[in-house]
Amino acid sequence: MKKLIVIDACMRDGESRTRRILNPLLEKLAERYEIETIRLDGQDWQAVGRRVLAERAAGHVPEETVAMARRIAAADRLVIAAPFWDMSFPAVLKVFIENMSLFNITFRDNGTSFEGLCRCERLLYVTTRGMNLRTGDPLETVTPYLRALSLLWGLGEVITVAAENLDYSSPSEIDARIDAAVAEGLAICREF
């Protein structure tokens, strides 16, 4: 069975609108994939700063970080779930990505260019946006970032499933937008 890794950066437990989209998609994907979920909560990973860079330069990267990066590099598919926060996504996701961006594990370079080392063929990004921003809007910065990361790591095609304008909608409109995103996501999951 192929391997799928889910990076869940949804910060609200019971009330996460993003997770309301994610969960039915994972049920569908579980029919074809062995799924490992990495749930970020802000306490797991330290920002990559001077100390971490000095440790890496000295050849020290914590074994758990290396093991996690190797699992991500070996995954056939990747799903990232995160709400739209402050024109991006929760900082914990960026910190996690920086920790997983390990030379000779997720990417390498030859002095003139880089090469992604991940075997992933597709990345599915699941999100909810309070604002009325569609994927591709100049203010929606996450999809372009994930496409750039995909080039660096070798993650393949980036597909975004989003429900928008949720902060300015009635409860019934929110439900309808989330239901539409779930339907779109389930259609994508058939071929993902």
Model regions and ranges:
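N-terminal beta1-alpha1-beta2 submodule of the flavodoxin-like/Rossmannoid cofactor-binding fold
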Residues: 1-102, 183-192
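A short, flexible beta-alpha/helix-coil linker loop
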Residues: 10-12, 129-133, 165-169
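Hydrophobic residues at beta-strand termini and immediately following loops
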Residues: 38, 126, 161
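Structured loop/turn residues at beta-strand edges in well-structured enzyme cores
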Residues: 73, 91, 118, 153-156
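Conserved nucleotide-sugar donor-interacting segment of glycosyltransferase catalytic cores
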Residues: 100-112
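Short, glycine-/small-residue-rich phosphate/pyrophosphate-handling segment
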Residues: 109-153
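Glycine-rich phosphate/pyrophosphate-binding loop and the adjoining helix
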Residues: 135-136, 140-192
